[in-house]
């Protein structure tokens, strides 16, 4: 499955989990949301963040789901381990300070 379709499934499932209609989401038109959920459009990062937060889920949860669709449970666990490890490594090389 393509990442675009995984993201589409994740957005649709998260919205349904929260019991929100496409019209009720209020951040984009129903037509645009439908195209996203069918995998016909890909949102910008900012729009993806806005939609996920309007649904009430963290954007990384939807993105993680998009990568995990179709994996076996142990593969999903391993994916989580890899992500945590890579984040730790990236943090070590982030030279900017807040």
Region spans (language model):
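Helix-turn-helix DNA-binding elements, focusing on the entry/boundary residues of the two helices
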Residues: 11, 22, 30, 45-48
């Amino acid at each position: 499955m393509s990442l675009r379709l995984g993201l589409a499934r994740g957005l649709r499932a998260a919205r349904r989990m929260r019991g929100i209609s496409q019209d009720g989401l209020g951040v984009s038109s129903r037509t645009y949301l439908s195209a996203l959920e069918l995998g016909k459009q890909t949102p910008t990062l900012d729009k993806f963040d806005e939609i996920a937060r309007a649904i009430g889920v963290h954007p990384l949860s939807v993105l993680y789901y998009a990568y995990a669709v179709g994996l076996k449970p142990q593969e999903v666990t391993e994916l989580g381990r890899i992500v945590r490890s890579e984040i730790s490594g990236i943090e070590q090389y982030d030279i900017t300070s807040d």
